[in-house]
Swiss-Prot record:
It comes from Rabbitpox virus (strain Utrecht) (RPV). One of its GO terms (molecular function) is nucleoside diphosphate kinase activity. Pathway: Pyrimidine metabolism; dTTP biosynthesis. ATP binds at residues 11-18. It comes from the Viruses. Belongs to the thymidylate kinase family. The lineage of its organism: Viruses, Varidnaviria, Bamfordvirae, Nucleocytoviricota, Pokkesviricetes. This is Thymidylate kinase. The keyword Amino-acid biosynthesis does not apply. GO terms for biological process: dTDP biosynthetic process; dTTP biosynthetic process; dUDP biosynthetic process.
Amino acid sequence: MSRGALIVFEGLDKSGKTTQCMNIMESIPSNTIKYLNFPQRSTVTGKMIDDYLTRKKTYNDHIVNLLFCANRWEFASFIQEQLEQGITLIVDRYAFSGVAYAAAKGASMTLSKSYESGLPKPDLVIFLESGSKEINRNVGEEIYEDVTFQQKVLQEYKKMIEEGDIHWQIISSEFEEDVKKELIKNIVIEAIHTVTGPVGQLWM
């Protein structure tokens, strides 16, 4: 039995990640494809993260970084098991978000990556570019929904993309929504059909 693919969607806040994930789930109906999003706010760490994001509690940046990381590690075994059972996972945010946001706040990217080292490695990361309209919509109730901060996050994403150790697919914000939806669907289908070998380990 071939394993499933780990496909991650990344991008700035309000770039359309959740929408595109849901499009995939609807356009490729299958009992071998599941959706997962981070942070998972139902767990102990997830509830702490939710309190932080909604400004109910404050923590120092190092604690915040570790909370997001721990939230992903809570699901590392689940992800590994699902992939080995032939289940493809469509994931809304992953370790790259954690590293980009931490680095945008001044943390060492190398140190932040070390916390995530060993997580299941994605077979494909789809990065959704944000146009000026989407970036300017990044004003909201949650703590990171700030235009200036989001621009810093974007620069950190670009650094990771340029490293070339992960298979990134950048989706331009210039595409019309129906074109973007079809393009992403085809990219995901190809990734599912071409995945080979054992599940890798991220940043090892």
